[in-house]
Amino acid sequence: MLKDQLRESRKLSFAIDPFEPGSTFKIFTAASALEHKTATINSTYYAEQGRMRVDNHWIKEAESHEKFEWISVADIIRYSSNVGTTKLAFDLTFPKLKETLKELNFGNKTGIEVPGESRGIFTEADNVTPLSLSNISFGQGIAVTGVQMMAAYAAIANGGEYIKPTLIKRDPNQVTVSELEPENANQLEKRRRVLSQKNTEDLTKALVLAVEKGTGGNAKIPHFQIAGKTATAQRVDKNGGYKGYVSGFIGYPVNVDRKFVIAVYIDNPKTGGYYGGAVAGPVFKNLAEYMLYKNKDISRLAEHEDNDYDLKKVKTNIDMVQVKEAASRSLTPGIVPNMMGLDKITTTNISLKLNLQVVHKGMGVVSSQYPPAGTPIGDDTVVKLEYSPPTYE
């Protein structure tokens, strides 16, 4: 039995292992702002014409031509604005954002019945630097699991009620082979409210706008309203650095009897570019159409001759993201640790644990550190880390 469980765990690496969610995380920053009343869905922010200086770093939009000026919260989601999300987070402040994320169960295991589930990487600090807050607001510098993301999106789809996820198995003929354990049989009765229904309605409308008139256009399904969000995140490789991309899309149909959330993350896509809307969106569309038209008119599923991501190919085209957490290092309070070879998520987590000021430069893994490991930490100590792409033998 244990061997079977471990095999299932390996198959579900995307679901239970941590990864940077990228822009699919922006909706939770917006949710927190609405919950704490620092913004409404129609509040507007000046998006600095595409770039904004934060802690001597530039926060930029994904495309150089995206020079947004005044932009509403709904349009921040629609166009996936990094600058707009940063402004939203700065008004909100980290303690309030953290409160909402904790309510949505980020930083904790969901308790799904699969061994080896990660809690993700989420700071326990009471506050963070402006740059860290900016990065976290749009899904960088934080690591989550696929199950955490789907459960949190389901809370929005459920009108603000969070339901603990559980694993159900059925055979190809839909005969149940694994039922809910008795203690979970009343799972639906254990739902807890984490967001107001009014706010989730506004968030859903923004996500629908993102699909119908924004970055998620390739996930549109005729005759249905789809709420969803794209992501294009840097890919963490086996050595803890960044190489390539992870393309993502999470969404759900609105006002339907068959309710579901689908999360698609494609590791290092080889065709169709690498943007989440272009690569993961069509996969979501095919899977969602199957769910929506199942036992109805499924003839529509054959209408994808121009799409590389045919349903028959979905299984082979999706390699679930597997991120290996960097080997733990011994940390001594008051002493600068050795951060050579670590990625930015890990160094950020370490610096927060030690209350250490860090300046990051570059991308990849740490190739240069000053002052060196073993140096006593003073009140004015600032550790400068330079990152470079990892090398391979």
Q: Predicted regions span which residues?
A:
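Beta-lactam-recognizing serine transpeptidase/beta-lactamase-like catalytic domain environment
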Residues: 1-22, 28-266
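Ligand-recognition elements built from short beta-strands and adjacent flexible loops
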Residues: 122, 223, 264-278, 282-393
